[in-house]
């Protein structure tokens, strides 16, 4: 869901469109190659997003080192990503810190929940995505990323 939201926000912003590439991958390989969960797609549809995400991918060392910024959903993901990175210039950001700075809270995984939990997760992802695109606009003119 985060990929779809962020792709949408970047595409809508002329200062970012064509300059920021959005991809996504998981820190575990459970769902590699699988399409998006139907409940996630439903939440995106209800919110008016076109859910054209790519099949699930795995965030291995090669994948991660090719990115400037990696946005993680949980503290465990931050740890996993940092363990795999060899490119130390890649910045790892906990998404929820963009919405609630300094609290170091995870984005709750709605996988075992109902539609309401997917909708709540999507709302958080939208807020984080808006903050992230704001940071990207600033970053394109600066060397630091605040999160």
Regions found by a protein language model. Give the residues of each.
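Short polar/charged helix/loop
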Residues: 1-147
């Amino acid at each position: 869901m985060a990929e779809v939201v962020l792709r949408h926000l970047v595409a809508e912003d002329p200062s970012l469109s064509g300059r920021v590439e959005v991809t996504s991958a998981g820190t575990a390989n459970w769902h590699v190659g699988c399409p998006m969960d139907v409940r996630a797609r439903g939440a995106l549809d209800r919110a008016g997003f076109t859910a054209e995400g790519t099949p699930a991918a795995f965030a291995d060392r090669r994948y991660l080192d090719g990115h400037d910024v990696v946005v993680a959903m949980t503290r465990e993901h931050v740890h996993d990503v940092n363990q795999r990175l060899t490119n130390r210039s890649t910045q790892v950001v906990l998404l929820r810190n963009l919405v609630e700075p300094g609290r170091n809270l995870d984005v709750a995984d709605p996988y075992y929940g109902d539609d309401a939990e997917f909708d709540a997760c999507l709302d958080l992802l939208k807020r984080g995505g808006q903050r992230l695109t704001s940071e990207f606009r600033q970053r394109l003119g600066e060397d630091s990323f605040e999160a």
